[in-house]
Design a protein with these regions (language model features):
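A general structural motif
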Residues: 1-2, 31-33, 63, 117, ...
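Beta-strand-turn-beta hairpins that frame and shape the catalytic cleft
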Residues: 1-6, 112-122, 166, 223-229
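Short, charged N-terminal beta->alpha structural module
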Residues: 1-21, 127-138
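Active-site neighborhood of phospho(di)ester-bond hydrolases with catalytic His/Asp-centered motifs
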Residues: 7-10, 36-41, 66-73, 107-108, ...
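Core catalytic region of metal-dependent phosphoesterases/phosphodiesterases
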Residues: 8, 13-115, 188, 192-195, ...
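A short acidic (Asp/Glu
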Residues: 17-19, 47-50, 78-81, 132-133, ...
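Active-site-proximal loop/helix segment associated with metal-binding centers of metalloenzymes
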Residues: 90, 95-96, 102, 116-193
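Binuclear metal-dependent phosphoesterase catalytic core
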Residues: 116, 200-205, 216-269
Protein backbone atom coordinates (compact mmCIF):
# COMPACT_ATOMS: atom_id res chain seq x y z
CA UNK A 1 0.00 0.00 0.00
CA UNK A 2 1.25 3.47 -0.85
CA UNK A 3 1.69 5.61 2.26
CA UNK A 4 3.75 8.45 0.83
CA UNK A 5 2.71 10.36 -2.29
CA UNK A 6 5.12 12.79 -3.92
CA UNK A 7 4.63 15.14 -6.88
CA UNK A 8 7.17 16.38 -9.42
CA UNK A 9 7.29 17.88 -12.91
CA UNK A 10 8.97 17.01 -16.21
CA UNK A 11 11.92 14.66 -15.80
CA UNK A 12 12.74 14.20 -19.51
CA UNK A 13 14.27 10.79 -18.89
CA UNK A 14 16.24 11.62 -15.73
CA UNK A 15 13.92 9.48 -13.65
CA UNK A 16 16.37 7.44 -11.59
CA UNK A 17 18.21 10.66 -10.70
CA UNK A 18 14.96 12.28 -9.54
CA UNK A 19 14.18 9.24 -7.37
CA UNK A 20 17.71 9.19 -5.96
CA UNK A 21 17.32 12.84 -5.00
CA UNK A 22 14.01 12.04 -3.30
CA UNK A 23 15.39 9.12 -1.29
CA UNK A 24 18.55 11.00 -0.30
CA UNK A 25 16.53 13.92 1.02
CA UNK A 26 13.92 11.74 2.72
CA UNK A 27 15.90 8.69 3.87
CA UNK A 28 13.04 7.59 6.12
CA UNK A 29 10.92 6.72 3.09
CA UNK A 30 10.37 3.05 2.33
CA UNK A 31 10.50 2.68 -1.48
CA UNK A 32 7.70 0.09 -1.67
CA UNK A 33 5.43 2.44 0.29
CA UNK A 34 6.30 5.49 -1.80
CA UNK A 35 4.90 6.76 -5.10
CA UNK A 36 6.16 9.62 -7.24
CA UNK A 37 3.67 11.20 -9.64
CA UNK A 38 5.36 12.76 -12.68
CA UNK A 39 3.16 15.42 -14.28
CA UNK A 40 4.14 14.62 -17.85
CA UNK A 41 7.25 14.20 -20.00
CA UNK A 42 8.76 11.43 -17.90
CA UNK A 43 10.42 10.30 -21.12
CA UNK A 44 10.11 6.56 -20.54
CA UNK A 45 8.73 6.16 -24.06
CA UNK A 46 10.65 8.78 -26.00
CA UNK A 47 13.31 7.03 -28.08
CA UNK A 48 11.26 3.84 -28.48
CA UNK A 49 14.42 1.72 -28.46
CA UNK A 50 16.97 0.26 -26.03
CA UNK A 51 17.61 3.66 -24.47
CA UNK A 52 14.08 3.62 -23.10
CA UNK A 53 14.54 0.12 -21.71
CA UNK A 54 17.72 1.16 -19.89
CA UNK A 55 15.89 4.13 -18.43
CA UNK A 56 13.03 1.92 -17.28
CA UNK A 57 15.36 -0.72 -15.83
CA UNK A 58 17.33 1.85 -13.83
CA UNK A 59 14.12 3.38 -12.52
CA UNK A 60 12.49 0.02 -11.74
CA UNK A 61 15.51 -0.94 -9.63
CA UNK A 62 14.84 1.96 -7.26
CA UNK A 63 11.70 0.23 -5.96
CA UNK A 64 9.61 3.41 -5.85
CA UNK A 65 6.28 3.38 -7.68
CA UNK A 66 6.10 5.86 -10.54
CA UNK A 67 2.79 7.18 -11.87
CA UNK A 68 3.00 9.11 -15.13
CA UNK A 69 0.68 11.71 -16.55
CA UNK A 70 1.34 11.72 -20.30
CA UNK A 71 3.21 14.75 -21.58
CA UNK A 72 3.86 15.94 -25.13
CA UNK A 73 7.38 14.55 -25.56
CA UNK A 74 6.54 10.86 -25.26
CA UNK A 75 4.53 8.17 -26.99
CA UNK A 76 1.11 7.26 -25.72
CA UNK A 77 1.20 4.20 -23.47
CA UNK A 78 -0.77 1.26 -24.80
CA UNK A 79 -0.74 -2.18 -26.35
CA UNK A 80 1.50 -1.01 -29.22
CA UNK A 81 4.24 -0.50 -26.63
CA UNK A 82 3.73 -3.94 -25.12
CA UNK A 83 1.63 -2.71 -22.21
CA UNK A 84 -1.59 -3.94 -20.72
CA UNK A 85 -4.35 -2.01 -18.97
CA UNK A 86 -4.96 -3.14 -15.39
CA UNK A 87 -6.96 -1.95 -12.41
CA UNK A 88 -4.67 -0.42 -9.79
CA UNK A 89 -5.96 -0.32 -6.22
CA UNK A 90 -3.32 2.26 -5.27
CA UNK A 91 -5.07 4.85 -7.43
CA UNK A 92 -8.54 3.35 -7.71
CA UNK A 93 -8.51 3.24 -11.49
CA UNK A 94 -6.91 1.85 -14.67
CA UNK A 95 -3.21 2.18 -15.50
CA UNK A 96 -0.96 0.90 -18.26
CA UNK A 97 1.98 -1.28 -17.20
CA UNK A 98 4.72 -3.42 -18.71
CA UNK A 99 5.23 -6.74 -16.93
CA UNK A 100 9.00 -6.24 -16.93
CA UNK A 101 8.68 -2.88 -15.14
CA UNK A 102 5.76 -3.20 -12.69
CA UNK A 103 6.71 -0.15 -10.62
CA UNK A 104 6.30 2.17 -13.62
CA UNK A 105 2.66 2.93 -14.28
CA UNK A 106 0.89 5.23 -16.71
CA UNK A 107 -2.45 6.94 -16.20
CA UNK A 108 -4.89 6.78 -19.09
CA UNK A 109 -5.06 9.91 -21.27
CA UNK A 110 -7.91 11.13 -19.11
CA UNK A 111 -9.68 9.42 -16.27
CA UNK A 112 -11.01 9.39 -12.74
CA UNK A 113 -8.87 8.14 -9.86
CA UNK A 114 -8.72 8.07 -6.07
CA UNK A 115 -5.28 9.15 -4.95
CA UNK A 116 -4.61 9.22 -1.22
CA UNK A 117 -8.33 9.61 -0.60
CA UNK A 118 -8.67 12.49 -3.09
CA UNK A 119 -11.17 12.29 -5.94
CA UNK A 120 -8.83 12.98 -8.83
CA UNK A 121 -9.11 13.86 -12.52
CA UNK A 122 -6.05 13.15 -14.67
CA UNK A 123 -5.56 14.79 -18.09
CA UNK A 124 -2.59 14.05 -20.33
CA UNK A 125 -1.12 15.68 -23.40
CA UNK A 126 -0.06 19.12 -24.64
CA UNK A 127 1.21 20.95 -27.72
CA UNK A 128 4.95 21.23 -28.43
CA UNK A 129 5.94 24.82 -29.17
CA UNK A 130 9.12 23.47 -30.77
CA UNK A 131 7.15 21.20 -33.11
CA UNK A 132 8.53 22.62 -36.36
CA UNK A 133 12.11 22.70 -35.07
CA UNK A 134 11.81 19.05 -34.10
CA UNK A 135 10.39 18.07 -37.47
CA UNK A 136 13.04 20.04 -39.38
CA UNK A 137 15.86 18.46 -37.37
CA UNK A 138 14.54 14.88 -37.31
CA UNK A 139 13.95 14.95 -33.57
CA UNK A 140 11.17 13.02 -31.92
CA UNK A 141 7.77 14.61 -32.32
CA UNK A 142 4.54 12.75 -31.63
CA UNK A 143 1.64 13.60 -33.90
CA UNK A 144 -0.91 12.59 -31.26
CA UNK A 145 0.78 14.60 -28.50
CA UNK A 146 -2.39 16.46 -27.55
CA UNK A 147 -5.49 14.92 -26.02
CA UNK A 148 -7.69 13.65 -28.85
CA UNK A 149 -10.80 15.68 -29.65
CA UNK A 150 -13.13 12.77 -28.93
CA UNK A 151 -11.45 12.38 -25.53
CA UNK A 152 -11.92 16.08 -24.83
CA UNK A 153 -15.62 15.80 -25.62
CA UNK A 154 -16.01 12.71 -23.46
CA UNK A 155 -14.10 14.27 -20.58
CA UNK A 156 -16.16 17.45 -20.73
CA UNK A 157 -19.39 15.49 -20.83
CA UNK A 158 -18.47 13.19 -17.94
CA UNK A 159 -17.15 15.91 -15.62
CA UNK A 160 -20.00 18.40 -15.96
CA UNK A 161 -21.14 19.56 -12.53
CA UNK A 162 -18.92 17.07 -10.71
CA UNK A 163 -16.48 17.79 -7.89
CA UNK A 164 -12.80 16.87 -7.86
CA UNK A 165 -10.44 17.33 -4.94
CA UNK A 166 -7.46 17.20 -7.28
CA UNK A 167 -6.72 17.71 -10.97
CA UNK A 168 -3.40 16.46 -12.37
CA UNK A 169 -2.46 17.55 -15.89
CA UNK A 170 0.54 18.32 -18.06
CA UNK A 171 -0.60 21.66 -19.44
CA UNK A 172 -3.24 23.94 -17.89
CA UNK A 173 -6.35 26.05 -18.60
CA UNK A 174 -5.79 29.13 -20.75
CA UNK A 175 -6.30 31.65 -17.93
CA UNK A 176 -3.69 29.88 -15.80
CA UNK A 177 -0.97 29.78 -18.45
CA UNK A 178 2.29 31.35 -17.20
CA UNK A 179 2.57 33.80 -20.10
CA UNK A 180 5.64 35.45 -18.55
CA UNK A 181 7.49 32.19 -19.20
CA UNK A 182 6.67 32.02 -22.91
CA UNK A 183 9.82 31.83 -25.05
CA UNK A 184 10.57 35.12 -26.81
CA UNK A 185 11.77 33.43 -30.00
CA UNK A 186 8.53 31.49 -30.46
CA UNK A 187 5.87 33.18 -32.59
CA UNK A 188 2.80 32.59 -30.43
CA UNK A 189 0.53 32.85 -33.47
CA UNK A 190 1.96 29.49 -34.60
CA UNK A 191 1.16 27.80 -31.29
CA UNK A 192 -1.91 25.60 -31.10
CA UNK A 193 -3.54 26.47 -27.78
CA UNK A 194 -6.78 24.62 -28.47
CA UNK A 195 -6.14 22.26 -25.60
CA UNK A 196 -5.67 25.10 -23.12
CA UNK A 197 -8.86 26.74 -24.45
CA UNK A 198 -10.68 23.45 -23.95
CA UNK A 199 -9.27 23.08 -20.44
CA UNK A 200 -10.54 26.56 -19.61
CA UNK A 201 -14.04 25.39 -20.48
CA UNK A 202 -13.45 22.22 -18.50
CA UNK A 203 -12.34 24.18 -15.42
CA UNK A 204 -15.60 26.16 -15.47
CA UNK A 205 -17.64 23.05 -16.25
CA UNK A 206 -16.87 21.32 -12.95
CA UNK A 207 -15.93 22.05 -9.35
CA UNK A 208 -12.32 21.50 -8.32
CA UNK A 209 -10.22 22.29 -5.28
CA UNK A 210 -6.58 21.85 -6.32
CA UNK A 211 -4.91 21.83 -9.75
CA UNK A 212 -1.31 20.71 -10.33
CA UNK A 213 0.45 20.88 -13.71
CA UNK A 214 3.92 21.02 -15.30
CA UNK A 215 5.05 21.64 -18.93
CA UNK A 216 6.36 25.21 -18.52
CA UNK A 217 9.55 24.27 -16.66
CA UNK A 218 9.22 26.28 -13.45
CA UNK A 219 8.35 25.50 -9.85
CA UNK A 220 5.92 28.00 -8.36
CA UNK A 221 2.39 28.80 -7.28
CA UNK A 222 0.42 30.22 -10.20
CA UNK A 223 -2.82 31.12 -8.48
CA UNK A 224 -4.67 30.12 -5.31
CA UNK A 225 -5.05 26.34 -5.39
CA UNK A 226 -2.97 26.08 -8.59
CA UNK A 227 0.67 24.99 -8.62
CA UNK A 228 3.21 24.40 -11.37
CA UNK A 229 5.95 21.78 -10.97
CA UNK A 230 9.28 21.15 -12.65
CA UNK A 231 12.32 20.03 -10.64
CA UNK A 232 10.95 20.19 -7.12
CA UNK A 233 9.48 17.16 -5.36
CA UNK A 234 6.75 17.79 -2.82
CA UNK A 235 4.49 15.76 -0.59
CA UNK A 236 0.91 15.67 -1.85
CA UNK A 237 -0.30 15.85 1.73
CA UNK A 238 1.76 18.99 2.36
CA UNK A 239 0.22 20.63 -0.70
CA UNK A 240 -3.30 19.82 0.49
CA UNK A 241 -2.53 21.13 3.99
CA UNK A 242 -1.06 24.34 2.51
CA UNK A 243 -4.26 25.23 0.71
CA UNK A 244 -6.50 24.21 3.59
CA UNK A 245 -4.55 26.61 5.77
CA UNK A 246 -4.69 29.29 3.09
CA UNK A 247 -8.48 29.04 2.99
CA UNK A 248 -8.54 29.58 6.75
CA UNK A 249 -5.93 32.35 7.05
CA UNK A 250 -5.37 33.81 3.57
CA UNK A 251 -1.64 33.35 4.12
CA UNK A 252 1.15 31.36 2.47
CA UNK A 253 4.67 30.63 3.68
CA UNK A 254 6.82 33.62 2.73
CA UNK A 255 9.46 31.55 0.95
CA UNK A 256 7.16 29.94 -1.59
CA UNK A 257 7.80 31.16 -5.18
CA UNK A 258 4.70 32.71 -6.74
CA UNK A 259 3.80 33.93 -10.21
CA UNK A 260 3.73 37.66 -11.05
CA UNK A 261 -0.05 37.43 -11.41
CA UNK A 262 -0.38 35.83 -7.98
CA UNK A 263 1.88 38.48 -6.47
CA UNK A 264 -0.23 41.30 -7.90
CA UNK A 265 -3.37 39.65 -6.55
CA UNK A 266 -1.89 39.30 -3.06
CA UNK A 267 -0.74 42.93 -3.10
CA UNK A 268 -4.25 44.04 -4.00
CA UNK A 269 -3.46 45.40 -7.45
Amino acid sequence: MIKNWRITGDTHGANSLRISYLLENEPELIPEETALIILGDAGFNYYLNKKDRRNKAETEAKGVYIYCVRGNHEARPGEKLGMKLVSDENVGGPVWIEEEFPHIRYFTDWGFYNIDGLRTLVIGGAYSVDKYYRIANNLQWFENEQLAYYDREACLRNTEGKHFDLVLSHTCPLSLQPTDLFLNFIDQSTVDNSMEVWMEELAHNMNWKLWLFAHYHTDRIEWPHVEQFYMEIESLNDIVVRWTRYDETGELDWWLPISPKMKRMMEGE
